[in-house]
Amino acid sequence: MKLKTTLTALAALVLGLSSAGAFAQVVGVSWSNFQEERWKTDEKAIKDQLAKLGASYISADAGGSPEKQLSDVDSLIAKGAKVLIVLAMDKDAILPAVNKAAQQKIPVVAYDRLIEAPGVFYITFDNVEVGRMQARAVFEAKPKGNYVMIKGSPTDPNANFLRGGQQEVIEAAITKGDIKIVGEEYTEGWKPEVAQKNMEQIITKSGGKIDAVVASNDGTAGGVVAALTAKGIKGIPVSGQDGDHAALNRVAQGSQTVSVWKDARDLGRDAAAAAVALAKGQKVAGAQTWNGGEKKVPLQAQFLKPVPITAKNLDLVVKAGWIQKDALCKGVDAAKAPAACK
């Protein structure tokens, strides 16, 4: 009887392990350009959540190449991915890969950047609101004068969502004549060096007569600040987003006005949970039907709430464990230090 009980227990254990393995999900993540600082945080959050859910993680980095991203998706599928999380380098170039996945009944999660294709699940922060927050912070600091708009990548739908939100805030002042836009440029690939070059050209064309810069993320803001600093231009309000450590340090130092914080830990966690649910054929909790893209394709979507971080509330990112105080306050003038650095 004892032997029979032991064998029964072993059989149950083996069956349980087999069942767990049978339902384990392989999640393939395609990164557009993993060299950017913030994606390291996203990846860790995705990995941690997948581990909690008993799923496994495989990934590929396109290194900024839309062509390589197509082959990356093929490779992830070949390696057994049952669901894909895709941070698209190019909203249009990625479509053949997304369509191929759909033909194989492999769900696709459009991560942070919109991919307009039927069946795609879209998860991001409210980018129109991010744009509003950026413009509000700059407008509060400089309600009149010459504005420069440094936009995101022309291949990323977020660039136009952000710009739309920014325009909502400053439109009335433009109409009134209080604000004049003296320069506006997209930033290929969201590259800081491209933003810096564009800003340098705008400074030259405007004769340095610039009062404020609405930059669409922290990378482009870094390029803007570098260009302004090189020309000896100080005290210009500059916006950004992502909560990059370098940007938060600039906010503490006073060279950047705001970084709209999109806690990538939340985005990564929720995207991983959505991916596993979709792979199991389940609905994603908290999702909504949305068709706000350029093509008006109806998608299931999930939007997270961003938080604008200025010198007044830098303590939030420290208390949240997003950045250490010494990194935040490095090089800050003690006489001008924000409360978070005292």
Segments and roles (model prediction):
Residues L10-A12, A22-F23:
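Cleavable N-terminal signal peptides
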Residues M1-A9:
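Bacterial N-terminal signal peptides that target proteins for export
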Residues L17-S19:
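N-terminal signal peptide c-region/cleavage motif recognized by signal peptidases
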Residues K2, A22-K342:
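A residue-level marker of the well-folded mature domains of exported/periplasmic proteins
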